[in-house]
Amino acid sequence: MILIPRGEAIFGTGPDDPYFEESSTDREKPQFRADIPEFYMGIYCVTNDQYFKFVKETGHRPPDQATMETPVWKNGKFPAEKAKHPVVCVSWHDAKAYCDWAGLSLPTELQWEKAARGFDGRIYPWGNKWDENKCRNYKNRGLETTCAVDSYPEGASIFGMFNMSGNVWEWCDDWYESNAYEKHARNDPTLPNTGQFKLVRGGSWHGDSPLPFRCAAHIPINPDDRVYWTGFRCVRCVGGR
C-alpha cells in the first residue's frame, strides 16, 4: 500500500474539464478544495488470486455468478492466466466482506478521487489530456476484457496507483446522493448512511468514451450487482482501519 499524504486537494468537475457542460457531470459539481486525513491505498485492485485466498479461508461465495455478462470464475475457480487480473463479478457486499477479512476498508469517494488525481486536480491520473493508450478501455483491448493489475504503468497516478482509470470500475464505500458534492463543498458532514445505490469510479475495459475515465467521474449502481467490469481496491487509515 502507498501512503496518500494529508494536504488540500481539488475535487469535482470545473470549467476546465471538457465535459463540464454535460448534464451527466452535474453530480460532480461544484468543484471544491478539501483537506482529508492521510491514509494508505492499495497500489493495485484486488486480484483473483487474492480473492481466492479469502474465499478458501472464509467460505464466502465465489464470484462465479453474474448479474450481467459471463463470470470469469466457474465452479469456485478462475483460469490460471487470470490470477493477476482484478476480481470482477463482486457486489459491494462481497467487496466489503473481503475488506473486513483483510482488516482494511473500501475507500470513500474523496479518498479515491484524491489518490487518483493528486493535489493539482488533474482530469486523468496521468494529466489533463485523454490518452487511450494509458489505460485499458474498449478501443485498445482487442478481444480481451480485463488485464493484469500491473499493466499500463504509464497511466499510474502521481502517487503510484495503477489503473485508477480503466480496467475495472471500483467500488467506493459511499451511498449515492445526487447533491453530495454540494455538501462536501460546504463541509456538511450529513451524508447518507443508507440508500438505494453505491458508487463506482474509474471506468473500465467496457468504456469507449473518455468521460467515465476522468478522476471526478462516478456512477451509482445497485450494491447487489455483480458485473464483469466492476472490482475494488482497499484502503487503510493511518493507525488502523
Question: Residue spans of the language-model regions?
Answer:
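Functional-site microenvironments in short loops/helix caps that host divalent-cation chemistry
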Residues: 10-24, 61, 66-219, 223, ...
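Short, compositionally biased
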Residues: 1-64, 92-93, 120, 127, ...
